A protein has these predicted regions:
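Structural helix-adjacent loops and short alpha-helical linkers that scaffold large soluble proteins
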Residues: 64, 69-72, 150-158, 196-204
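Secretory-pathway/luminal and periplasmic proteins that interact with or process carbohydrate-rich
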Residues: 83-89, 149-155, 215-219
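Active-site rim elements
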Residues: 172-182, 193, 206-208, 222
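Contiguous mid-protein beta-loop-alpha structural module that forms a pocket-lining wall or clamp
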Residues: 184-217
Length: 255
């Protein structure tokens, strides 16, 4: 007697989503499993399928940035905040692969690169391994990781101009204990752009920031990467910002 068996797949405990989780597929190695809110219809399903197809590229890029091998993650594509253009952002519960591996990303109909970028933003935070979480430093690093793996698909999320328009306050020698302030995040975005323009790689920056941990500032990062006195970071950066011919009008003003 034969009987067809349907494998039961437990629904992940999403941080915010409470609707139906439609299974879309998993990568061959089982590292990434993708779901979608069926209410999104064909455009949402297309987003999820395109994310699944791109997932291993994103994971490989993220692993290279942090010099580590990440863990398995679940992702659901849905309309965060009711948005279907990616502007709802992304979310997860923690900056690790144990309790933060259920990731929510906003649908972006017709713009798969935006969905992949949102995935990387959260995946990078998992790779920070409980460091930099909820801080301006970690938020800037997360956004740079997303930008670097998606050809800046989230350009409209730029915060460095907010920093410039608010008097360019110093968040190089101090850390803002929030990831919700566009001014402090923007300072970090511009500072990382500056370090990249000096020849340092995003991998060097990311790995040193994780090593420095929550107490690390961008000034201490500068000191570790250059061998120079960390006290020189802010004045040198500030002088170079002042000398920018076009000012700060993107997250990569030195690029």
């Amino acid at each position: 007697m034969s009987q067809s068996l349907k494998t039961h797949r437990p629904v992940p405990n999403w941080p915010g989503f409470r609707g139906t989780s439609q299974f879309v597929g998993a990568t061959p190695d089982g590292i990434v499993t993708v779901y979608v809110d069926p209410k999104l219809g064909p455009p949402g399903l297309a987003n999820a399928q395109e994310l699944l197809a791109d997932a291993l590229r994103v994971v490989a890029a993220n692993n290279a940035i942090f010099g580590t091998t990440g863990g398995a993650v679940n992702i659901i594509v849905y309309a965060l905040g009711g948005a279907t253009d990616g502007t709802g952002g992304a979310d997860h519960a923690a900056c690790n692969y144990q309790t933060g591996n259920n990731i929510e990303v906003c649908a972006a109909f017709g713009s798969p690169a935006r969905v992949s970028a949102l995935f990387e933003a959260e995946l990078s935070e998992c790779s920070m391994n409980e460091q930099l979480c909820g801080l301006s430093t970690g938020e800037a690093l997360s956004r740079w990781c997303a930008s670097s793996t998606s050809n800046n698909a989230l350009a409209d999320f730029a915060t460095a101009p907010d920093w410039a328009q608010n008097g360019e306050p110093d968040f190089v020698t101090k850390v803002d204990p929030t990831d919700q302030n566009p001014v402090s995040t923007g300072c970090g975005m511009a500072f990382i752009s500056w370090l990249l323009s000096k020849g340092h790689t995003l991998a060097q920056i990311a790995q040193q920031m994780v090593t420095d941990g929550d107490a690390g500032t961008f000034a201490t990062l500068y000191g570790a990467l250059t061998g120079d006195n960390p006290a020189n970071a802010w004045p040198e950066f500030s002088n170079d910002v002042t000398a920018l011919p076009g000012g700060v009008n993107s997250d990569n003003p030195f690029g």
